[in-house]
Amino acid sequence: MKHVVFLGDGMADEPFAPLGGHTPLELARHPSQGEFGLTRTVPSGMPAGSDTANLSVFGYDPKIYYSGRSPLEAASMGIPLAPEDVTYRCNLVTLSDADNIENAVMIDYSADDIFNEEAHELIAAIAPLYAAAGCELHAGFRYRHCLVLRAAASGAELTPPHDITGKPVAGHLPKGENRALLLSLMERSREILRKHPVNQKRIEAGLHPANSVWFWGEGRRPALTPFREKFGIARGGVISAVDLVQGIGVCAGLEVIPVAGITGNYPTDFAAKGRAAVEALRSGFDFLYIHVEAPDECGHHGEAKEKIWSIEQIDEKIIL
């Protein structure tokens, strides 16, 4: 028997006044719908996020298996980790222009979803700074990257940047363990990034510059029971453009199926995911976890119409 789990990340929502008190899912056309129901994907007392929620949907209780977001992303990037290593998600973000980072405002947690080539050039420009500080900065995809501290203590208090969009960053800068190092890296990276030619060109083009880094999602290497052993599935795969979801798959022993044209945002090739899924099922996969990030990105940006459109594209080009 074939099994497929499809997850439209962030697709559910609260009623929204500008939409007449409806949700995007209510207003979207989705003729392929089946039965609706309610479920709790994040256990009570745990922070709500794509990491804990996707672990649950994969079948792994976050209260048992969750060890942080960034080590899952590190797994998808092929970064080897020892049990004593600590990782952090490193976003390229846009902060308001302020002499002191404590006086800045979080303008954009993704720097206008910066292009991959630009992001890698910026990461390469600041990586020597990190090496000199005794840590590693690994380039990921678009605005999502990874900081690794080898044999380090954990316990930093960090805020996801998408939770403070449009707000002052004061009060949300690193606290707790590794505070001094993380804050120093942020401040020194900002000095380099603000002057970088890539950002000067982005400003001239009317795009947000990636003028700072932002650390969050601290964690250590997870230990997931292999999916095959846990559920008796002979061959399983993951289709997603998001490092986090790919990383859960890698840690669970599933295959990550590459799909050209998918972006982890709402300008993405929805149909390509559908075609890849059909081909995978025909070629011997018994289980697929298909993840689409588009609705979640629209939600973070407050783009209701784009979220409705994304839901309709999912129904028409993947489910149908």
Predicted feature descriptions by range:
Residues 206, 297-320:
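A long, amphipathic alpha-helix that forms part
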Residues 220-306:
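Anion-binding catalytic surfaces of enzymes that hydrolyze or transfer phosphate/sulfate esters
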Residues 4-6:
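Residue-level marker for buried hydrophobic side chains located in beta-strands
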Residues 2, 11-127, 148:
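Active-site nucleophile/metal-coordination loop of metallo-enzymes that catalyze phosphate/sulfate
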Residues 8, 97, 291-295:
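Short loop/turn segments at strand-loop or loop-helix junctions that form parts
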Residues 27, 119-124, 182-193, 270-278, ...:
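Short, hydrophobic/amphipathic alpha-helical packing segments
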Residues 109-212, 218-220:
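Glycine-rich, mobile lid/loop segments that gate access to catalytic sites or pores
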